UniProtKB/Swiss-Prot annotation:
One of its GO terms (biological process) is signal transduction. It comes from Homo sapiens (Human). This is SH3 domain-binding protein 2. GO terms for molecular function: phosphotyrosine residue binding; SH3 domain binding. Binds differentially to the SH3 domains of certain proteins of signal transduction pathways. Binds to phosphatidylinositols; linking the hemopoietic tyrosine kinase fes to the cytoplasmic membrane in a phosphorylation dependent mechanism. A motif (SH3-binding) lies at residues 201-210. Residues 252-266 have a biased composition (Basic and acidic residues).
Length: 561
């Protein structure tokens, strides 16, 4: 008997309801029951679940066709099935509960549709619990449901005599929160249909997904909040939608500089170009020619980089003479050879500093001759400062616009969110040039509105209770600000959920962010091109299904002011 007790089955993590029902043997009972919510936010909710008792494990699904369970637990260590009189309400007339021998473990509450159903479920659960312990109690079955009620419940509700030690149930059970029942759904019927079209199809792909998720099961010490539908693996696709800045950034760079792809491979100096474009410092002028001369010198001294490395002094003196006579030829060669000469300096940095003083002198001697050529190779790294020198006279016309008090703030707006490389991070560079010709007040407001959402707003969790805990931690007294908000991952489907603290009801409110045709919305009538513009809208417009709730404070963000 003791050897048998050590082999209590462990709930299977990802199995469809139909697959479980068709497994040979082991299914004691299956049917629909109402299950009490497991989190603090859902204690008053009793969603309908399809429950299967299989080999002394209880599984519950959203429906009989679900691809994976909402949760499951082993009956190991549970020693009593009782009526739950304290949970009886007008909606739950026939509740019952399954109690663990240890008070540290969860008590599970279910509600049947009739007295007969409750007797049947309780009798079968009692039989499963006593499988290894009380062979004499096995005659308890559904036929007892027709017997006297008091005698039936007296026999069923008697605790099973078991010992606690052999049951390692801490990390075997798991539960997926029924959070989709707690969302504030849109008032109009159309968004509901849109949700069906958008969200129901992904419910079936998850069955193959749990395989990469399997390492996560061992990481969960207490399993009552485990997410089994695999939203974790499905979530990476949405961030690329909001994280497109990186791709867009590369595209913008390629438009800005056609030779950028070539430079990206050989040299780490590429980041210098964007800096010069947006904020050209005059201090870089003497060093830029120095950076430009080594490529000219390497090509004029020898056709390949190998002869250049042995004798640095001799090559440098001869290159000075050659450069004085053939500067234009070398600069033309640079356009085709600038990839090859930049390879060696990365592998042999010491020679470059040794020769740099001579290059700088040469650069000081020949600035007029070089200034005539930069038009040919504006794309390379070095020619940027000369190219920017030319527009300086034009800049003399700009001071009339630039002295505006708003404009100096724009650089701060670009750099202020240290944690926010958002998909709008480069949107400032486009409006800034046209805005110089326009009147200042309106454009500066537009630029301000395009500040990206900080990364701290996106919380990497699927639990509303976890977000509530984070919100309360922001205040010493545990009272979050009204309108404090963040965006978390959805626990049931691929997508995002807007979580807002409602001070009037002293709780968080969840709004699923729907998406269709690259548009985002909380309710069907108002569509937005991005999550950022949607959040901006609800800073000044009341959220759906509420009288006065606005988005006011992004979580974890302290402004630059």
């Amino acid at each position: 008997m003791a050897a048998e007790e050590m082999h209590w089955p462990v709930p299977m993590k990802a199995i469809g309801a139909q697959n479980l029902l068709t497994m040979p043997g082991g299914v004691a009972k299956a049917g629909y029951l109402h299950k009490k919510g497991g989190t603090q936010l859902q204690l008053l909710k009793w969603p309908l679940r399809f429950v299967i008792i299989h080999k002394r494990c209880v599984y519950y699904f959203k429906s009989s066709t679900s691809a994976s369970p909402q949760g499951a637990f082993s009956l190991s260590g549970y020693n009593r099935v009782m009526r739950a009189a304290e949970e009886t309400t007008s909606n739950n007339v026939f509740p019952f509960k399954i109690i663990h021998i240890s008070k540290k473990h969860r008590t599970w509450f279910f509600s049947a549709s009739s007295e007969e159903e409750r007797k049947s479920w309780m009798a079968l659960l009692r039989r499963e619990i006593g499988h290894f312990h009380e062979k004499k109690d096995l005659p308890l079955d559904t036929s007892d449901s027709s017997s006297d009620t008091d005698s039936f419940y007296g026999a069923v509700e008697r605790p099973v005599d078991i010992s606690l030690s052999p049951y390692p149930t801490d990390n075997e059970d798991y539960e997926h929160d029924d959070e989709d029942d707690s969302y504030l759904e849109p008032d109009s019927p159309e968004p509901g249909r849109l949700e069906d079209a958008l969200m129901h199809p992904p419910a079936y792909p998850p069955p193959p997904v749990p395989t990469p998720r399997k390492p996560a099961f061992s990481d969960m010490p207490r399993a009552h909040s485990f997410t089994s539908k695999g939203p974790g693996p499905l979530l990476p696709p949405p961030p690329p939608k909001h994280g497109l800045p990186d791709v867009g950034l590369a595209a913008e760079d390629s438009k800005r500089d056609p030779l950028c792809p070539r430079r990206a491979e050989p040299c780490p100096r590429v980041p210098a170009t964007p800096r010069r474009m947006s904020d050209p410092p005059l201090s870089t002028m003497p060093t830029a020619p120095g950076l430009r001369k080594p490529p000219c010198f390497r090509e004029s001294a020898s056709p390949s980089p190998e002869p250049w490395t042995p004798g640095h002094g001799a090559c440098s003196t001869s290159s000075a003479a050659i450069m004085a006579t053939a500067t234009s030829r070398n600069c033309d060669k640079l356009k085709s050879f600038h990839l090859s000469p930049r390879g060696p300096p990365t592998s042999e940095p010491p020679p470059v500093p040794a020769n740099k003083p001579k290059f700088l002198k040469i650069a000081e001697e020949d600035p007029p001759r070089e200034a005539a050529m930069p038009g040919l190779f504006v794309p390379p790294v070095a020619p940027r400062p000369p190219a920017l020198k030319l527009p300086v006279p034009e800049a003399m016309a700009r001071p009339a616009v630039l002295p505006r008090p708003e404009k100096p703030q724009l650089p701060h707006l670009q750099r202020s969110p240290p944690d926010g490389q958002s998909f709008r991070s480069f949107s400032f560079e486009k409006p800034r040039q046209p805005s110089q010709a326009d009147t200042g007040g309106d454009d500066s407001d537009e630029d301000y509105e395009k500040v990206p959402l900080p990364n701290s707003v996106f919380v990497n969790t699927t639990e509303s209770c976890e977000v509530e805990r984070l919100f309360k931690a922001t205040s010493p007294r545990g009272e979050p600000q009204d309108g404090l908000y963040c965006i978390r991952n959805s626990s049931t489907k691929s997508g995002k959920v807007l979580v807002v603290w409602d001070e009037t009801s002293n709780k968080v409110r969840n709004y699923r962010i729907f998406e269709k045709d690259s548009k985002f919305y909380l309710e069907g009538e108002v569509l937005f091109v991005s999550v950022g513009s949607m959040v901006e809208h609800y800073h000044t417009h009341v959220l759906p299904s509420h009288q006065s709730l606005l988005l006011r404070h992004p979580y974890g963000y302290t402004g630059p002011r």
